[in-house]
Amino acid sequence: MTLAYDRVGSGPPLVLLHGVGHRRQAWTAVVPRLRDQRELIMVDLPGHGESPPFQPGGREPVQAMAEEVIAFLDELGLERPHVAGNSLGGALALIAGSEGRAATVTGLSPAGFWVHRRQFSYAKAIFKVMEVTGAGIQGSAPRLARSTTGRALLFAAVVSRPSRLSAEQALGDTQAFMIARPAVDLILANPLWFTAPIEEQVPVTIAWGTKDRLLLPSQADVARRQLPHARHLPLPGCGHVPMTDDPDLVARVLLDGSTLPTPTEPAATAEPAESAPDRPAER
């Protein structure tokens, strides 16, 4: 399967994976902040955006999607790039790390760390509401996307500052969600529980929006227990999709996450990238 992607910038390659129901343009706000220091590869996941339909073919859906992403890395000749993702994309980045295909992993509110199954049912219900709402407002979506109130109605569940979405981006994201509905239904058929071990020499960063209303911040505690060697950070004031809520903060997290030293490197090399302001406080 050939996936749709954009490739910009220069530096070490950083693959960016969006969440379920989203598209590669999820990363638009952080691109100008990173492109001078990273080669950025933003990809539409199978069944999303401009990529071909998702066909798991009897495989477990999330694992099937991870296999497609790894095959995509092979197509581009990327042996062990830095990999980062949001939500489902964060889970896929972690799977890549567990399979030795990522130099570093950064997960922004990654899926797979439920406190209990009810949290999955809650998230699934939100997606169902979004699906029904999207189907019901298709004719009026352009008008809603142009208004601050309309963007709040459409995106309050996934961003904390919907007014920061442009009308064009809001409309595109609404249309992308409807395109991805078959893939969303497959992914949400059963909960993903991330339990795969990641070698300690693979630097991992987990960052969670403190105002995440979809994958609740309590799941960050599960991630901390599951991945004790990772760096765990809050994203103050950010919702589930933090890239537009605070692109400066997210860019710093991505930059730092893809420059963390391995345990074999001297401690003196563990410095933030030159242009990055102070790192967010660990928690």
Regions found by a protein language model. Name each.
Residues 6-54:
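Conserved HGGG/HGGXW glycine-rich cap/lid loop of the alpha/beta-hydrolase fold
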